[in-house]
Design a protein with these regions (language model features):
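Domain-core detector
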Residues: 1-152, 160-231
Length: 231
């Protein structure tokens, strides 16, 4: 029980950091609660992934126990990755995702407006995202189910409402194909590393990609079940 409490406390500390991102945006309470629940789950899976990786550092290549100094050095590298490098990127993503989820609740379902995809418009924008710039489609178009911003780590893209009579409609099939390209990057494993970003934070009431690798670590499903029971 003490181990479970320590585990839960560590996950909660990480969740508190991400919850700043959620609290910075105005949104309906139902949306806020759903996003906070997602943040808590993600934080728990992140904690589990870090501890699992750390546990594999205890032994050397021959299967013997590492000297403490060697283990501590390796652990510090893992800790820096998870709690500095990754955390910074994840927090910035959480801020953008929370803002976009909040905006989704404000978009009209009527016949007066369409939605338009816009980049930050500077030289830091990815070419694949530039090709999505200006995409204009109804809120009901399936494009927004998969390629609503943000579309990757450090993505600063935005979606706004525009009057229907001010901008021509985009070709849905063509921009969906461009969205697929923008979220495709085949890694060394042969898997698409960007496919996880094909979701809509506002429509699905999620902050983090549901297919994130943290959720695929050995034992992650048990952790998720434990966290859902002990929220």
């Amino acid at each position: 029980l003490q181990t479970e409490k320590a585990y839960k406390d560590l996950a909660s500390q990480t969740a508190d950091i991400f919850n700043f991102a959620v609290s910075s945006s105005d949104m309906p309470e139902v949306m806020r609660t759903a996003l906070q629940n997602d943040v808590y789950l993600f934080s728990g899976l992140k904690t589990h992934a870090q501890l699992f990786e750390a546990s594999r550092l205890l032994l050397d290549e021959s299967g013997g126990l590492k000297p403490y100094s060697a283990f501590a050095n390796d652990f510090n590298k893992v800790n820096k990755n998870y709690n500095q490098t990754y955390l910074n990127t994840e927090y910035e993503y959480a801020v953008n995702a929370a803002q976009m989820a909040a905006k989704w609740t404000e978009f009209s379902d009527g016949d007066r407006y369409n939605l338009q995809y816009r980049t930050a418009g500077d030289n830091r924008v990815r070419d694949s995202h530039t090709r999505l710039n200006g995409t204009t489609l109804p809120k009901s178009d399936p494009f927004w189910d998969l390629y609503y911003a943000p579309n990757g780590w450090n993505c600063r893209c935005n979606v706004v409402e525009v009057l229907k009579d001010k901008y021509p409609l985009s070709d849905s099939k063509k921009v969906i194909a461009e969205g697929e390209k923008a979220t495709t990057q085949i890694g060394k494993s042969g898997k698409n590393q960007l496919e996880i970003f094909r979701f809509n934070p506002g429509k699905q009431k999620l902050i983090f990609p549901p297919g994130h690798p943290y959720g695929k670590v050995v034992g992650a499903s048990k952790v998720a079940k434990f966290l859902n029971i002990n929220k």
